[in-house]
């Protein structure tokens, strides 16, 4: 059964319920803490009022008024938490109703009977087999009616949500410069805002606020090298992160320490290391976190791994401090003497250890912090680290990918306009499956650069301003994009948009064929081998003559080929 069924959609949409569920749990714990804190504060304030027997009534009145104000502030905070809880629960209800809507698009028994009556002309054995399969599907799982226009609209909404999810997470823009209005800086939120004008229920089907916060923290780390947002997120979720033996706190302190060294604050970096990094060299500090967890075995492995990894990274910091202090001293001496750099300094700066320690100040530390943040974020909310749209695309591309992909000579999308091919089909590992917009854009741009100057001139691919039309989003569709490239592509696997994603996917499991023992002729046509060998009455003598010469004739083109040149194409 290859058609998506009702149970299939229920299973694939389970992750939509995880984030609201975790947010409800987190919000409930905050309510408990708030109530407990207010209870203790209220008891203390009342006891103080009772003990103040000698004080004037006016002073007692001030204490009571202060108590009332504190309680009113508590009620406002509590109401905010209650509103959040209602919002999270409404998201769960909306997503449940969204899945329940599929029940309306299920194929009914009447539809099955009509389909069975329509297939009465087939063989009896096949009829019995189909009837058994239909009854099993109706009892255990239910097929969806893809001819229902409402179901198509439902799929369109789900596709829009996948695109919004991808754009929110991968957004790198912080502000729109088109106008002065307060438009959302996240391009995914802008798309969601436009979609909700016609379908307001989409707001309940995606956790846009949480994903936006995730994107802000990620962009602040990778692009801005700012630790303020990640520190705030860590403090907000510190208790939950300790339960999963998170290494995020070390990554934050590690980046902060290297930032101080990079600025030249050696003394401040040493003091910061003593207060915030020295404890990670002692394994006992990790054991304290492990004892508070239930899963002792798995958490113990994680603790041991974190300790060994952090210890190795801490060992390199001492050497970095020595070399950076020597470098600063040499700079100070050179400024005082205003002479050329001494030979010892040149040897030190060009030495291999110094270059190795200098690598610690590269962007790798920010990438490591960002990766640790992604792992902790996805683990807290029980979601996948991959984009959901990539998962769906991978499933669809795997069903289309064959061994002829990247080898079709008629597909010129990856060839120069001069006819020189490009080797993308020899297990090239240069294209990694990274979830990054810049990489995806790099694939498209690399294909755009294949256009020669002559082709660009002939096809008028540049505007009056000198900007290439190929960079214009409106020309990225199938009607303009490949035409401007002057190339042909009829395969989604080989397209530049999906080539990178589909490269490492498995081939489709082609275990059936409409032909019996199909063979491919040199001209590309495929026929059952029995049809090529079995002569008809009209061409009986001609085929017999060809077979004696070990040759066959194409029934359509009338071309003659040797049998040895035919290739068996099944199984793939």
From Swiss-Prot:
The lineage of its organism: Eukaryota, Fungi, Dikarya, Ascomycota, Saccharomycotina. This is Protein FYV10. It is found in: Cytoplasm; Nucleus. A zinc finger (RING-Gid-type) spans 491-557. GO terms for molecular function: ubiquitin protein ligase activity; zinc ion binding. Residues 110-142 are annotated as: Disordered. PROSITE patterns: ZF_RING_GID. Residues 210-268 form the CTLH domain. Involved in the proteasome-dependent degradation of fructose-1,6-bisphosphatase. Keywords: Cytoplasm, Metal-binding, Nucleus, Zinc, Zinc-finger. GO terms for biological process: negative regulation of gluconeogenesis; proteasome-mediated ubiquitin-dependent protein catabolic process. It comes from Candida albicans (strain SC5314 / ATCC MYA-2876) (Yeast).
